[in-house]
């Protein structure tokens, strides 16, 4: 169904439902249902033209006709998913509204949540139009005055996000992955609630189990808490949460479910300089020094994974590098039979935002790769920020890569074909390691496979970056915190002083007291939640402000008197919050308006983001599809008159926007590398996600390489989130996307295809 037909069908159903519920009397339920369908009608009619304009020019930003992918397309697709859900729900309401089994409160809550999401998506469409009229032709990232982009990003982060993490969580992704995303979001908000208490692992687990069931029962509460976490908690929280998979129990369970391999050994490479031959003249050598940045010389940890035990992998020389991991170190001694060395070698660099995870986190899919490719894999455990900011990780990865090239025989490979592979931050490091290898004059890999890589670390805007408003893994504030930490910016000290003061016994006593308290409060929370779901009213006379016992929106929104519903309520999406009332409604905080009247007239020396380039030569090069009407759209208000997106109730959020020269360094942002550097890269194969906030990183990097005549391919996985490699075993769609990565590596290594 095309966009216009979908919109017209939704508007027709909304008007029919409005007419029905407006005739049901003056009750609160009927009034709210009438209002929500009025809001759906208004937002759908306003959104359709904006999406149409984006879609009409989206093809100008594709890599080629065979790869229709960029942030504009992704934004339109996401809005279509929201419209499709509202269309389905509106049809359901129209068919069942007279039934005695019609769940009024549930359907109202879901309609309100998706109306809020549709309103925010409409705002994103207008932001995308502003980028379209301001960016240079064919460019997805904004390039210009840094003050302008800072103002744009600070304005963007004030948008309300909680609606995307409650009932609407993951609506844009494939249905098979949504239950997993819900589990992750519940775990994140539970983890966040106990994070600041400095609790030990057992206390966090027990507290989350008994007290945080309300996050599963109440989607609106979960969304509000998720929004609070992504705005207020520092990078140490995200580092701790993303490293949960490193816990021994969880990693053991993952290993039990993954492919069994003969070799999985952690190696420690000593910080010793060695010589490497130059590719231009093998008789000449260059010295590869050990990593030195920030902490001085130190060992580099790597993990060798091989499905078969191959020659060299049980040698005494390699064993001297082995770092014991317990029983797994005995695995080789039980299997003395050896296979010949493989022609191929894969050097892998894991992702994790430069701040989290290790090769152990990525071991499950690496084992599958080792089996499918029949080649050993060396995964690098580089040092993480904030303890080891840029360029420590790059130095360690380059050192480990050179060591692997020089000692490939010990790793079970002849080294005829070498592939660099990585995901996310690891993809970034794959590019920069190869650039450094070319600069040193040593052997570059035969190809690079980068899954959803980060190629632009500078704080800037692009259409796909707008998707971070609803992304569960890569909210813009989290991206900014990770990048600033990797760049070496000052971060808040991790609050561990209390733990040091208490000591071991003090921690045990404190955690015991907290656990008993949480058991007591948790039982009360669960009981009240289930009583409310059963329709019984419970009046809490005394509720702690730090741990509120909130009622679900399904009951509270329908039983609360009209006058007591605050305009800033997180539990009920009032119609005036969605821009359906005039601006005379009072609010606790003023609406942020980007109209010309609010911003005031621009002085000649002031750069106005809402205006196109004053230099007509730039815009004269734009394709005909970008007509004059689109170019001057920003001269008036940022949004149409009467439209006001929801703003964040958490107050103004501080987000570091780093534009220091270091983030423009090609070793941090390879997209900004000069042509002469990019021309030294080997064939590049990128596998991206259509709904990833970093999609434009992949598209623009591929476009740059293609423009230089460099061999590059781009494959885009549909309907999947960033990080799908770690979810490879979850569903058919993630398995297919992971198989696409393996197929790209196989192409680099010149390996035969898998048996049919």
Swiss-Prot record:
GO terms for biological process: cholesterol metabolic process; diacylglycerol catabolic process; ether lipid metabolic process; lipid catabolic process; termination of RNA polymerase I transcription; transcription initiation at RNA polymerase I promoter; triglyceride catabolic process. A motif (Involved in the stabilization of the negatively charged intermediate by the formation of the oxyanion hole) lies at residues 350-352. One of its GO terms (molecular function) is monoacylglycerol lipase activity. The active site is at residues 424, 692, 722. It is an enzyme of class 3 (hydrolase). Phosphorylation by AMPK reduces its translocation towards the lipid droplets. Residues 542-570, 581-600 are annotated as: Disordered. The keyword Secreted does not apply. It catalyses: a diacylglycerol + H2O = a monoacylglycerol + a fatty acid + H(+); a triacylglycerol + H2O = a diacylglycerol + a fatty acid + H(+); a monoacylglycerol + H2O = glycerol + a fatty acid + H(+); Hydrolyzes glycerol monoesters of long-chain fatty acids. Monomer and homodimer. Interacts with CAVIN1 in the adipocyte cytoplasm. Interacts with PLIN5. Lipase with broad substrate specificity, catalyzing the hydrolysis of triacylglycerols (TAGs), diacylglycerols (DAGs), monoacylglycerols (MAGs), cholesteryl esters and retinyl esters. Shows a preferential hydrolysis of DAGs over TAGs and MAGs. Preferentially hydrolyzes fatty acid (FA) esters at the sn-3 position of the glycerol backbone in DAGs and FA esters at the sn-1 and sn-2 positions of the glycerol backbone in TAGs. Belongs to the 'GDXG' lipolytic enzyme family. This is Hormone-sensitive lipase.
């Amino acid at each position: 169904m095309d966009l216009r037909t979908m919109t017209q069908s939704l508007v027709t159903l909304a008007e029919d439902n409005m007419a029905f519920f407006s005739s049901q009397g003056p009750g609160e339920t009927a009034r709210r249902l009438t209002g929500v369908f009025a809001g759906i009608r208004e937002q759908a009619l306003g959104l359709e033209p904006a999406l149409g304009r984006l879609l009409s020019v989206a093809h100008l930003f594709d890599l080629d006709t065979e790869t229709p992918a960029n942030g504009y397309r992704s934004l339109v697709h996401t809005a279509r998913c929201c419209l499709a859900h509202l269309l389905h729900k509106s049809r359901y309401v129209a068919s069942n509204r007279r039934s005695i089994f019609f769940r009024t409160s549930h359907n109202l809550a879901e309609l309100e949540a998706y109306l809020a999401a549709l309103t925010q998506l409409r705002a994103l469409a207008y932001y995308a139009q502003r980028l379209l009229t301001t960016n240079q032709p064919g460019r997805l990232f904004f390039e210009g005055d840094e003050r302008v982009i800072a103002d744009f990003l600070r304005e963007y982060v004030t948008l309300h996000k909680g609606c995307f993490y409650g009932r609407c969580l993951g609506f844009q992704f494939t249905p098979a992955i949504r239950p997993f995303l819900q589990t992750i979001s519940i775990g994140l908000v539970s983890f966040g609630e106990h994070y600041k208490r400095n609790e030990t692992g057992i206390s966090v687990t027990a507290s989350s189990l008994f007290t945080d069931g309300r996050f599963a029962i109440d989607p609106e509460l979960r969304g509000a808490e998720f929004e609070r976490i992504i705005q207020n908690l520092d990078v140490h929280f995200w580092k701790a949460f993303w490293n949960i998979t490193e816990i021994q129990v969880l990693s053991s369970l993952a290993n039990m479910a993954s492919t069994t391999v003969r070799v999985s050994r952690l190696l420690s490479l000593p910080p010793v300089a060695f010589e490497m031959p130059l590719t231009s003249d093998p008789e000449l050598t260059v010295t590869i020094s050990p990593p030195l940045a920030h902490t001085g010389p130190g060992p580099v940890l790597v993990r060798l994974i091989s499905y078969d035990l191959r020659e060299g992998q049980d040698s005494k020389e390699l064993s001297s590098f082995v770092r014991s991991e317990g029983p797994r170190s005995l695995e080789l001694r039980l299997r003395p039979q050896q296979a010949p060395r493989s022609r191929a070698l894969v050097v892998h660099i894991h992702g994790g935002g430069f701040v989290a995870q290790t090769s152990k986190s990525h071991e499950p899919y690496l084992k599958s790769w080792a089996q499918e490719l029949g080649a050993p894999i060396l995964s690098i455990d580089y040092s993480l920020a904030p303890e080891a900011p840029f360029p420590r990780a790059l130095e360690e990865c380059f050192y480990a890569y050179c060591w692997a090239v020089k000692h490939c025989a010990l790793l079970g490979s002849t080294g005829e074909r070498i592939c660099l592979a990585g995901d996310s931050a690891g993809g970034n490091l794959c590019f920069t390691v190869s650039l450094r290898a070319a600069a040193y004059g040593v052997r570059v890999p035969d190809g690079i496979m980068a899954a959803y890589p980060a190629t632009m670390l500078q704080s800037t805007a692009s259409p796909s970056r707008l998707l971070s408003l609803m992304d569960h893994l890569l909210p813009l504030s989290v991206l900014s915190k990770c990048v600033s930490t990797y760049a070496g910016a000052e971060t808040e000290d991790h609050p561990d002083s209390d733990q040091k003061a208490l000591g071991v016994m003090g921690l045990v006593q404190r955690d015991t007291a907290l656990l008993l308290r949480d058991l007591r409060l948790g039982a009360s929370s669960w009981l009240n939640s289930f009583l409310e779901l059963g329709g019984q009213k419970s009046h809490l006379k005394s509720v702690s402000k730090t741990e509120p016992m909130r009622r679900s929106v399904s009951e509270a929104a329908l039983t609360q008197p009209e006058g007591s519903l605050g305009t800033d309520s997180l539990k009920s999406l009032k119609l005036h919050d969605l821009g359906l009332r005039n601006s005379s409604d009072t609010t606790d905080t003023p609406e942020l308006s980007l109209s010309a009247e609010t911003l005031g007239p621009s002085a000649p020396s002031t750069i106005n983001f809402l205006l196109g380039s004053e230099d007509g030569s730039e815009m004269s090069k734009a394709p005909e599809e970008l007509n004059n009407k689109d170019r001057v759209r920003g001269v008036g208000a940022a949004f149409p008159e009467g439209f006001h997106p929801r703003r964040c109730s958490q107050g103004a959020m501080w987000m570091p926007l780093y534009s220091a020269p270091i983030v423009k360094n090609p070793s941090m942002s390879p997209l900004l590398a000069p042509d002469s550097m990019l021309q030294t890269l080997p064939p590049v194969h990128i596998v991206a996600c259509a709904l990833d906030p970093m999609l434009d990183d992949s598209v623009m990097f591929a476009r740059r390489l293609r423009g230089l005549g460099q061999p590059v391919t781009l494959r885009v996985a549909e309907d999947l989130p960033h990080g799908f490699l770690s979810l490879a075993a979850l569903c058919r769609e993630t398995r297919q996307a992971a198989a696409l990565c393996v197929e790209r590596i196989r192409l680099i290594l010149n390996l035969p295809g898998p048996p049919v």
